[in-house]
Every structure is written in structure tokens, then in C-alpha cells.
Amino acid sequence: MFGNKIKKLILGYRASSDVYINFLRKQGIEIGNNVRIYRPFNTTIDFQNPHLLTIGNDVQITGPVTILTHDYSWSVLKKKYGYIYGNQRKTEIGNNVFIGWGATILGGSHVGNNVIIGANAVVSGIVEDNSVYAGNPAKKIMSLADFKAKREKRQLSEAKAYVREYKLRFGVIPPESKLTEYFFLFKKNDDVKTFHEMLTLM
């Protein structure tokens, strides 16, 4: 408890995911349920224009992520030409979205539902539903269904590699509790009590 108070004193509204999200909601940003910010202390979510940002349900924000609703590059135009060309646009993030490490969501972006944004992607414009995007600028690299098929195909070989490397490092076969991402390979759907936490992460 004391440690949490010190952490909040030092980091302020970025002390934890819940503290950050509550702060953003108080500013007026619309944020759904089951949203998680994994590294709140170095994730930047623009609250200058809270009415221009909406984040849906079941959104996983890794770190350090940046989500914007504005662009200050007009300062160069102002210096050169003496005019201000404002650039404040609505940014929307849908439901069931994963935003990878180091990604940037630029102002005016619309991220659909059931979307994976790859690490260090720079998103601008429309991101289609049920898709995986990556790169700078971010582009669609596959559908979510194709990504599922790709991951499904690799599950057994990756699980075997995990077990092999664990045994090489520690000299023993890993316990079931270590195989949190592969339990569907050896557990029936009605026998997953040990892995209940993994099934209820969001």
C-alpha cells in the first residue's frame, strides 16, 4: 500500500493503468471496458482534445505507445508564412484491439474492431476491421483469419521448442503452469481450471 502511494506521488496520473484511465475519463475521453495500458509511465495519450478521442472495449495498449488527436507541425508554416493551419481530428479505436510496442496512432485515424497493430507501426487513416497492420506507414499485412491460421499452424512446434529450451536451461521439464500460452494443446475445454486467469485476461 505504501509503495503504491509513493509510486502515485512520483508518477502522478501515470502511476498505473487504472489511475491513467480514470484520469483520461475525467478529462472527457470516452474509454470502454477492459482497457489495459501496460506501461502507463511512458505511454502518451493526447487529452488536449478529449472530445476527439474514443477508445472501445477490450483494448490492450503496450508501451511506449502514442495516441494523438492533433499535429503541431503547423508551427513551421506559421513561422514561414504567418498563418496557422490547425490540424485537430477525431481519433477512434474500436473494440478488441491490440496496439503493439512503440506504435503511434496519428490524429484522424480510425482503427476498426478486432485489429492487431504491430510494433513500431505508425497508423494514419482507416484501419479495417478484422485485420493485422504493421510498418511505417502502417499497412494491412493480412486478415485476422489468416493470422489465426498462421499462429495455429505453429503452436505445436513452438510449444516443443519452449519445453526443449526450458529443459536445457533448468534441467527439468517445465510444469504445466509455465505453459500458459499452449495449454489448449494438452487440456480439454472443460479442464482448464489451472489456466482460468489466461482465459479471463480481458
Question: What do these predicted regions represent?
Answer:
Residues N34-V35, V127:
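Short loop/turn and capping residues at structural boundaries
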Residues F47, G82-Y85, N120, S157, ...:
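Short amphipathic alpha-helical patches
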Residues D129, A134:
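Catalytic binding pocket for nucleotide-activated donors in carbohydrate/polymer assembly enzymes
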Residues M1-G28, N33-N34, A138-M202:
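Terminal amphipathic alpha-helical/low-complexity segments used for targeting or macromolecular assembly
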Residues W101-I116, A121-G125:
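Beta-rich strand-turn-strand
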Residues N22, I29, R36-H110, P137, ...:
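Flexible, glycine/small-residue-enriched loop-and-beta-strand segment within the central core
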